[in-house]
């Protein structure tokens, strides 16, 4: 099998996006369009990925700093052929070269594998698609069924404009052939640009075979030149993700109101209500229920967990049979054990909460360790920050913390301790101790409240 190199064209400015971002950095499912294409190239086990860039070079390089690509600069954008000419010096003669577009993010590995398999030994294969409205696309010109040319919209005559089979721009041939044809391109056309479409005519002139594979799903090859098209690609992508999850057994209450911006691994009988967003890598156990409006990013969630509406989790783990929300926030480093209860307006950050413990209302637990079977009342705060440094609070097992308690870290609360409501804890508490620190309550009989002056 020949080696494979992929060339991704990503030099365009994207004027119709009306944005400072290069077009290919606009996102589908939370990921830049060009990153989708790079990931597909990786799935094909490409030996090299050449990224043609121009506009927004610094932004592209910063967003894609970790990607294994060969950066190829295109100073002037003089057409697709000109872009490929910049990459040609890197082509090995005996390798396959696959040309892709950074603003067509939904192209699939399976379609590209079919295209590569269809490439003649001595020839070129291109990906086409039939469109009801082919306006703006290069038309496929055939003679006796064989592809002989591609004519761009602005260069097509009246008869050619009636053709509905169009060029997607995706093609594959060997490096030696591409280099030969690229050297013979000219810009004698209405746009004054160098078209890769002219390569098909040159291949025919040289007696090379031209194969064509038609994409079965036209959305796979759609690009995004403006935000309307970008939104259409987003909705289509989300529709396909929702469809797949439903067929795998996940109950999406309304598939049209669910967004997956990463990967979701799931067990059986999971149920996800409307307007839930999944980001990054999320793993659900069996029978997990997620209420409306939740946002969950990079989390692992155990069996039989119930997440009530409008909760936001990031980089957290949740044990089996836990109940969380509504309106709860788990920040990075939150680790909840089995059968924990986290209630409304509770925030947990870089903290562990032991099995069976309850933090039910209006509480902040940060940089802390909470043992098993504890109860933290409403308004409890772990005061973990002195303006410069973070400190840890350690709470043992079976500890009761009353409402409106401040735990000023660093502080340790031993097993079985009880802390009365309104207490400010600044010293360690021993095992089974009761701690109360309150201003003595005063009663003033006959007190007259101040009155407003009229």
Swiss-Prot record:
Predominant place of localization: cytoplasm
Quote the pathway field.
Answer: Nucleotide-sugar biosynthesis; UDP-N-acetyl-alpha-D-glucosamine biosynthesis; N-acetyl-alpha-D-glucosamine 1-phosphate from alpha-D-glucosamine 6-phosphate (route II): step 2/2; Nucleotide-sugar biosynthesis; UDP-N-acetyl-alpha-D-glucosamine biosynthesis; UDP-N-acetyl-alpha-D-glucosamine from N-acetyl-alpha-D-glucosamine 1-phosphate: step 1/1; Bacterial outer membrane biogenesis; LPS lipid A biosynthesis
Cellular localisation: Cytoplasm
Region: N-acetyltransferase, residue numbers: 249-454
Does the entry feature the keyword DNA-binding, yes or no? no
- Please state the Enzyme Commission number of this protein: 2.7.7.23, 2.3.1.157
Q: How is the cofactor bound?
A: Binds 1 Mg(2+) ion per subunit.
Q: Which residues bind acetyl-CoA?
A: 378, 384-385, 403, 421, 438
Coiled-coil residues: none
Q: Which PROSITE patterns match?
A: HEXAPEP_TRANSFERASES
Disulfide cysteine pairs (residue numbers):
none
Question: What is catalysed by this protein?
Answer: alpha-D-glucosamine 1-phosphate + acetyl-CoA = N-acetyl-alpha-D-glucosamine 1-phosphate + CoA + H(+); N-acetyl-alpha-D-glucosamine 1-phosphate + UTP + H(+) = UDP-N-acetyl-alpha-D-glucosamine + diphosphate
Q: Name one GO molecular function term.
A: glucosamine-1-phosphate N-acetyltransferase activity
- Region Pyrophosphorylase, residue ranges: 1-227
- GO annotation (BP), single: lipid A biosynthetic process
- UniProt-annotated catalytic positions: 361 (proton acceptor)
Identify the residues that bind Mg(2+). 103, 225
Q: To which protein family does this belong? A: In the N-terminal section; belongs to the N-acetylglucosamine-1-phosphate uridyltransferase family. In the C-terminal section; belongs to the transferase hexapeptide repeat family.
Please give the name of this protein: Bifunctional protein GlmU
Q: What's the encoding gene here?
A: glmU
């Amino acid at each position: 099998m020949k080696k494979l190199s992929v060339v991704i064209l990503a030099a365009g400015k994207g004027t119709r996006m009306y944005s400072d971002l290069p077009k290919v950095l606009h996102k589908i499912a939370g990921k830049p369009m060009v990153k989708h294409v790079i990931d597909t190239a990786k799935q094909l086990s490409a030996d090299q990925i050449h990224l043609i860039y121009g506009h927004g070079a610094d932004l592209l390089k910063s967003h894609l700093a970790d990607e294994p690509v060969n950066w190829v600069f295109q100073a002037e954008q003089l057409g697709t052929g000109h872009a490929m000419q910049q990459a040609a010096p890197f082509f090995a003669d005996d390798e396959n070269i696959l040309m892709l577009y950074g603003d067509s993010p939904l192209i699939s590995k399976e379609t590209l594998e079919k295209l590569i398999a269809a490439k003649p030994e001595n020839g070129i294969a291109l990906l086409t698609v039939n469109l009801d409205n082919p306006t703006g696309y290069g038309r496929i010109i055939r003679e006796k069924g064989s592809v002989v040319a591609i004519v761009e919209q602005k260069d097509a005559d009246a008869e050619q404009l009636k053709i509905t089979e169009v060029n997607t721009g995706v093609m594959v041939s060997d490096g030696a052939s591409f280099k030969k044809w690229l050297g013979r391109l000219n810009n004698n056309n209405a746009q004054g640009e160098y078209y890769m479409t002219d390569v098909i005519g040159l291949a025919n002139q040289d007696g090379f075979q031209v194969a064509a594979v038609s994409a079965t799903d036209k959305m796979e090859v759609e690009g995004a030149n403006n935000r309307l098209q970008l939104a259409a690609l987003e909705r289509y992508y989300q529709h396909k993700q929702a469809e797949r999850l439903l067929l795998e057994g996940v109950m999406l209450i309304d598939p049209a109101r669910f967004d997956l911006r990463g990967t979701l691994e799931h067990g059986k009988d999971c149920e996800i209500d409307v307007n839930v967003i999944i980001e990054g890598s999320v793993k659900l156990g069996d029978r997990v229920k997620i209420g409306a409006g939740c946002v969950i990013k990079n989390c692992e969630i155990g069996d039989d967990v119930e997440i009530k509406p409008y909760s936001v989790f990031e980089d957290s783990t949740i044990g089996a049979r836990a109940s969380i929300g509504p309106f709860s926030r788990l920040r990075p480093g939150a680790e909840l054990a089995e059968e924990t209860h986290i209630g409304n307006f509770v925030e947990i950050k870089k903290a562990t909460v032991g099995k069976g413990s309850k933090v039910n209302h209006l509480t902040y637990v940060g940089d802390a360790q909470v043992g098993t079977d504890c109860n933290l009342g409403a308004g409890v705060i772990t005061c973990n920050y002195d303006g410069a440094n973070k400190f840890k609070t350690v709470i043992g097992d079976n500890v009761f913390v009353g409402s409106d308690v401040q735990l000023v870290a660093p502080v340790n609360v031993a097993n079985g301790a009880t802390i009365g409501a309104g207490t400010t804890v600044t010293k360690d508490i021993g095992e089974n101790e009761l701690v109360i620190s309150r201003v003595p309550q005063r009663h003033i009989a006959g007190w007259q409240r101040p009155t407003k002056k009229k």
